[in-house]
Design a protein with these regions (language model features):
Chain A
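Conserved HGGG/HGGXW glycine-rich cap/lid loop of the alpha/beta-hydrolase fold
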Residues: 13, 17-71
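Active-site loop/oxyanion-hole signature of alpha/beta-hydrolase fold enzymes
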Residues: 60-106, 273
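Flexible "cap/lid" loop of the alpha/beta hydrolase fold
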Residues: 112-116, 122-157, 628
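Conserved alpha/beta-hydrolase catalytic His-Asp/Glu region
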Residues: 136, 157-213, 218
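Short beta-strand/loop motif that positions the catalytic acidic residue
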Residues: 222, 228-230
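Conserved nucleotide-sugar phosphate-binding/catalytic loop shared by glycosyltransferases and other
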Residues: 331-382
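A nucleotide-sugar donor-handling region in carbohydrate enzymes
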Residues: 440-444, 448-544, 574-576
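Donor-nucleotide binding loops and adjacent catalytic segments primarily
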Residues: 507-606, 657
Length: 697, 288
């Protein structure tokens, strides 16, 4: 899912050729973002748009030949004057008098021409990795001098089957010299291949880039303020071009040392801050009525972030926060949180930071990534990249303004990742909490998935080696034995050894105390469960992903009921699945929502659940028999959670793909009401975690 | 040692009196650091000058009665009109066309006058802990009677002409305790006490009388006439001029208000980093 959808989309039509664009409405100054079509389109800005749209009005064009725009094959339609006319038509259509123009690569000359021809309309220009003839190009653009690979830049080749893809794959590899750029690479290749080679060939043929003399003349006519951003290891456009362009235009120059050609994709946080700073400088940063509290007058404050993927984090984090407040009664805790975590926090009377409303939804993304009984959570996390950067920027603004002493992030991937990527932005003490360490590949993902998980693990390990001061404390929710016995992949260390060195262990945090055996009859009576019936609770969590599992279990119900007449099945669908869509059967009750579901789970005779950690560990703590079905392709449920449950000797792991209703019915009748020999689940976890955190205050 | 030395030290003669000024740095825009009440002189900007001079240029001058400018025991020499004329003379002498004004406490009076009467020369105005007659006096100051004769004045009774003339150091000691409500302000108190003792009670009485003409009506009239942007910075714990005065001035001028929670009457000396950054942000905004 995107971090934020445009408020509107539009099309300008000049003589039957249409250019598509998106609009993000805001009261602030207008930014016009021009991608270098036809190699890419407006989505190339995905890492920076969500945040900039909170501060400015945004117009994002796709450019001819790509995205939602037409793909004219006449090179004359791609000529600079035509592009200029398209951009003006767009500004006219949107009633924009003046805009700050942001352009990348060969879109920079377009932006400069717009500023030169219409100085009254362009407040300023941000030129990223400019392709402009003010300094010599890399030798590899010269067919005679090109090193291997660059000879794929060849129209004839592009017109052959698969030829254009070869070039694009090579080219984007060159554009991203930064290690660990797999996602940006996949994105770039995907967008480039959205269009056909012919459109790109036409675009190139019509490009009409200014010659060296023309470029210098163009620069000499510019009057507006400019910012040039250029990576020092840009293999597409030499940094000398950015430097020279800045000299010629008296622009601010920011060289990103170690960056390649796509800094807006690879270092979005830095680029967002540069663009924001530039626009504020030329349009005036709004002063706002505010309060700054003197250091000595400040109460101790913590900002708590709880992952919204599943409700389990919310409950354990509330438990930790309560313990923390008993250790530091003066501590004020704000929560930067989103639905469904906020529901738990509101019920607990916790203070939710108002900026929470700006967060892009992670749980909606996860729901959108799920199909049937399947959620490839590693890829889902990778594809959540633009949501993570948008949410990180909200977080960063909150910590810079809120003067927090402490940040606690329970699997707050955005904070952990982007503070390591932009370590100078860190504020206060920082605690990282997680219940698993290490991305693990699913076997059917083959070598490529193993390569990707290894790359992600390597990046995390490098982050922590290089900047050990970003995580002031890392807490593993569990014990050392709960860490999987695998390695991080490739030549990387064993996960358990590395975790022992870099984490403290809190023990498991349940967030609730399971009932004593003698309390169970009274609770069952209160919940309406008789002694002489076998109560099987089927629960699938809050997202829509559970339908497939429920269907299978409901299909198994008649078979199980036949074998076990005292069976009563309570199916809890969660808010996103309509209970009315299931068949009616005697002894089968389908409910949308059950208050305090954990109470039902803790006194049932058998539970059927997915493989999520929180629910399964609640059942383990309550010593209930249960069947759990890890979601397909969900490495955490299939490896990490399963490993932990096996250590507790808890539950029976089932395979959704191969388990048919007969198997399920047989397992239900076999296990319902049977005693278990689970290992005790610790009950001091929240207290221990709070002590580990409190030492930092 | 000072953090930086002036680029220009000059004296400008205005209607027969000599005003001493300093210019630091060469950048644009100029930040004109206005003199405040005669209690202290231009050195009270010592925590701002080096920083502002690096980003802009800083211009400061002494008012009458304390520091290197002229002195007088005539109240008329201390009117807001006189201060405003001095400021314009300094801008002319330093060849500064337009400046951002920054004024502390009762400098709000001449700041508002400059903003209203010289719109072409003022880009924006920052009022720190402004003393403007827009609110009732702070409750603890209601005991003060300027012209009364107290045998043994306590607290704000010490804000009194007779006391200043007879035991000026005692008044200074008292007032410093009210200016610096923040704990651990010993250095700031020593500095300001030293500057205060460079003048005397007699002069301070004249200067106080000179301010009397700046009443609520004048304040409202001048605030309404000015158009350039305003930033008000006011400590929540200001025990000399209540935070409500700053809030009222911000509202009256359509300006922004930044509250320093826990701050007293001299936030620019006690929280110089925050105040410097606020001035810079404001100046960047109005000078673009």
């Amino acid at each position: 899912m995107r971090a934020r959808l445009p408020d509107r989309t539009g099309v300008v039509d000049r003589d039957g050729v249409r250019v598509a664009y998106e609009v993000f409405e805001h009261n602030g100054p207008t930014l016009l973002l021009i991608p270098p079509s036809a190699i890419t389109h407006g989505r190339v800005w995905k890492g920076i748009v969500g945040t900039l749209a909170r501060h400015f009005r945004m117009l994002i064009t796709d450019g001819l030949g790509t995205g939602g725009s037409d793909r004219p094959l006449d090179p004359r339609r791609h000529a600079p004057a035509e592009v200029n006319a398209d951009l003006c038509a767009l500004l006219d259509a949107e009633g924009v008098d003046v805009a700050v123009v942001v352009a990348h690569c060969h879109a920079v000359p377009w932006a400069l021409r717009l500023a030169a021809d219409h100085p009254e309309r362009v407040l300023g220009v941000v030129a990223i990795s400019p392709e402009i003839e003010v300094a010599r190009e890399h030798d590899h653009w010269n067919p005679k001098l090109a090193p291997p690979g660059w000879d794929l830049h060849n129209k004839s080749l592009w017109r052959t089957e698969g030829g254009y893809r070869k070039w694009i794959e090579f080219f984007f590899d060159q554009q991203l010299p930064e290690p660990h750029s797999t996602k940006q690479y996949e994105d770039g290749v995907g967008w480039a291949l959205d269009t056909a080679a012919e459109a790109k060939i036409a675009g190139d043929a019509g490009l009409g880039e200014p010659t060296a003399d023309e470029a210098e003349q163009l620069c000499a006519t510019l009057r507006c303020p400019m910012l040039v951003i250029h990576g020092s290891v840009d293999l597409c456009q030499p940094v000398a071009r950015g430097i020279r362009l800045a000299e010629l235009t008296d622009a601010d120059l920011v060289i990103l040392d170690g960056s390649g050609h796509l800094p807006h994709a690879r270092d979005p946080v830095k680029v967002i801050r540069l663009i924001t700073g530039f626009v504020h400088r030329i349009t005036g940063e709004p002063m706002t009525t505010t309060t700054w509290t003197r250091g000595r007058s400040r109460a101790k404050r913590a900002l708590y972030l709880s992952s919204p993927i599943g409700l389990g984090h919310a409950r354990r984090d509330v438990a930790v926060a309560k313990e923390l407040k008993t250790l530091h009664p003066e501590l004020e805790i704000d929560w930067l949180a989103q639905d469904p975590v906020t529901r738990v926090l509101e019920a607990e009377g916790e203070r939710i930071h108002p900026a929470s409303r700006w967060l892009a939804s992670e749980s909606a993304h996860i729901a959108a990534e799920s199909t049937g009984h399947d959620l490839h959570c590693f890829q889902a996390l990778r594809r959540m990249d633009e949501i993570l950067v948008a949410n990180f920027m909200v977080f960063q603004e909150v910590v810079e303004e809120g003067c927090y002493d402490l940040t606690v992030g329970d699997e707050a991937w955005d904070v952990d990742y982007y503070w390591h990527e932009n370590p100078e932005l860190k504020r206060g003490q920082n605690v990282w909490l997680t219940d698993f360490v290490g991305f693990l590949p699913m076997p059917d993902g083959g070598d490529h998935e193993a390569y990707l998980t290894t790359d992600y693990n390597a990046e995390m390990i490098e982050h922590i080696d290089r900047f050990p001061w970003i995580r002031d404390r890392a807490i593993f929710v569990g014990s050392g034995q709960d860490v999987v016995p695998d390695t991080f992949g490739g030549q990387l260390p064993a996960i358990r050894d590395w975790t022992n060195e870099h984490f403290a262990y809190s023990g498991y945090i349940t967030g609730f105390t399971p009932p004593d055996p003698e309390e169970i009859p009274a609770i069952r009576e209160r919940l309406g469960y008789r002694e002489d019936e076998m109560v099987c609770v089927v629960a699938v969590g809050g997202s829509g992903v559970g339908r497939a599992l429920i269907d299978k279990v409901v299909a198994a119900y008649p078979l199980a009921k036949k074998a076990m007449p005292e069976l009563r099945m309570i199916v809890v669908t969660g808010p996103r699945i309509d209970p009315a869509t299931f068949p009616e059967r005697a002894g089968l009750e389908v409910r949308g929502y059950v208050d305090r579901l954990y109470e039902h789970l803790s006194v049932c005779d058998l539970a059927v659940v997915q493989g999520g950690l929180t629910t399964t560990m609640e059942l383990a703590a309550a010593k209930r028999p249960f069947l759990y079905f890890p979601l397909g392709h969900h490495f955490e449920q299939n490896f990490h959670v399963r490993h932990r449950l096996e250590r507790y000797r808890a539950g029976t792991c089932m395979d959704y793909a191969t388990g048919d209703p007969d198997d399920i019915a047989a397992r239900i009748t076999e296990l319902a009401g049977k005693p278990v020999d689970y290992r005790d689940v610790e009950t001091e976890g929240a207290e221990r975690a709070a002590h580990l955190i409190a030492e930092l205050l | 040692m000072r953090a930086c030395q002036p680029t220009v030290e000059g004296v400008v003669e205005r209607d027969g009196v000599a005003v001493r000024f300093e210019r630091y740095g060469e950048g644009e825009p100029a930040i004109l650091l206005l003199p405040t009440w005669t209690l202290v002189h231009a050195r009270h900007w010592k925590m701002q000058i080096a920083y502002l001079a690096r980003h802009f240029s800083a211009l400061c001058f002494d008012g009458p009665g304390n520091g290197g400018s002229y002195t007088s025991t005539e109240p008329a020499a201390y009117s807001d009109v006189a201060y405003a004329r001095n400021a314009v003379a300094v801008l002319d002498a330093a060849e500064v066309d337009k400046a951002v004004l920054v004024g502390l406490s009762c400098a709000a009076s001449w700041g508002l006058r400059l903003r209203a009467e010289h719109p072409g020369r003022v880009l924006g105005a920052v009022f720190i802990a402004p003393a403007v007659p827009l609110m009732p006096r702070l409750p603890e100051r209601r005991v003060q009677r300027f012209d009364a004769v107290f045998d043994d004045p306590v607290d704000w009774e010490k804000y009194n002409a007779h006391h200043w003339k007879t035991d000026y150091p005692d008044f200074v000691r008292f007032l410093m305790g009210r200016i610096f409500t923040e704990p651990h302000s010993t250095k700031q108190i020593e500095d300001a006490t030293g500057w205060a003792l460079e003048t005397d009670g007699e002069t301070l009485v004249a200067s106080d009388l000179g301010l009397l003409g700046f009443d609520e009506r004048t304040t409202r009239k001048l605030a309404a006439r000015g158009t350039c942007p305003v930033l008000v910075i006011h400590g929540s714990d200001d025990a000399v001029r209540g935070h409500g005065e700053g809030a009222a001035l911000a509202e009256l001028t359509g300006g922004e208000l930044v509250t320093i929670a826990g701050g007293g009457h001299f936030p620019h000396t006690r929280d110089p980093v925050r105040v410097n950054m606020l001035i810079k942000q404001f100046a960047d905004g109005v000078a673009r």
